[in-house]
């Protein structure tokens, strides 16, 4: 599966409707966010049991604010609708695989 785009309007539906969801909160001006994007695509394709959802913080500030996001990129891992882990900054693929 490829990554999916989510918004403030539908992110909760995605989180609640799937067992494992990794929400990548990013921005188009964020260099580390852009560097992380292909790694997240690989994680999504190699782990069909994990939904990798990308949320543009500039267009959707509500979710970032609700989860207290202070820096980008921030990845939030949800299991059965509950936040279970948080990663900040550009992460190597092994860290993302361990989290998911």
Where do the protein language model's features map onto the residues?
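Typically the conserved alpha-helix immediately C-terminal to a functionally engaged Cys/Sec
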Residues: 34-46
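Conserved two-component signaling phosphotransfer/partner-docking surface
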Residues: 92-94
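A short, hydrophobic beta-strand/beta-hairpin element that forms part of a small beta-sheet core
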Residues: 73-86
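Hydrophobic beta-strand anchors of alpha/beta hydrolase catalytic cores
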Residues: 22-23, 52, 75
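A short beta-strand-turn-helix
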Residues: 4-20
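Thiol-based oxidoreductase modules, predominantly thioredoxin-like and allied folds used
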Residues: 6, 41, 48-61
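Short pre-active-site segment immediately N-terminal to redox-active cysteine/selenocysteine motifs
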Residues: 19, 26-29, 71
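Conserved small/polar residues in nucleotide/adenosyl-binding loops
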Residues: 30, 98-99
């Amino acid at each position: 599966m490829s990554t999916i785009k989510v918004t403030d309007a539908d992110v909760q539906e995605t989180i609640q409707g799937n067992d494992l969801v990794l929400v990548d909160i990013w921005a188009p001006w964020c260099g580390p966010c852009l560097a992380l994007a292909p790694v997240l695509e690989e994680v999504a394709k190699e782990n069909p049991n994990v939904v990798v959802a990308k949320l543009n913080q500039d267009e959707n500030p509500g979710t970032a604010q609700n989860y207290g996001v202070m820096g980008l990129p921030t990845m939030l891992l949800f299991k059965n609708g509950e936040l279970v882990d948080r990663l900040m900054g550009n992460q190597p693929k092994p860290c993302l695989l361990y989290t998911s």
